[in-house]
């Protein structure tokens, strides 16, 4: 079973019958055939029944061209809470979401940073989680390490003298993306990245008590740090 969203109505989707085979292939890839790929490790959707009877999780959005009736793959992802969609992720945010969820191994980004068009790829990414108690409250440090490759600015390769500054800007950009994702997930009580598991490894009793009272996500803090370096 593969689950996905599309902005098309049922009638509009039926008019794209010539590309249904492409949709089926993409659905198969999303439910596990991506395991052989270098960039994805598992299916990129997750839905669970919430305590209120609605669905929690996230679903990919299959994009189509209404005019040419072409299938354009997955370009967005929607987050759900209690059956209601509340956030739409795309581009770098969607890739970061999959990375933090353990469902992607690398990033391939084309975005705007400080008014310039910046593109880059990553290699050898690794996430480390370090739990502690900061000011008496559970705290988690999430650190991303790895290599930056093929960095361009406005279509041109980065000069050696600009490499260090560009690396700092890219790391700062990824930190902002991760903070936005944290506000859209953990800070709302949606622990899609399983941060509570890491916190419980440090202090099981305290975290279990906070989970029982429903206050863990209000009290615990998460800091993300990107420390990528040039190849």
Place the predicted regions along the sequence by residue.
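A glycine-rich, acidic short-motif signal
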Residues: 1-231
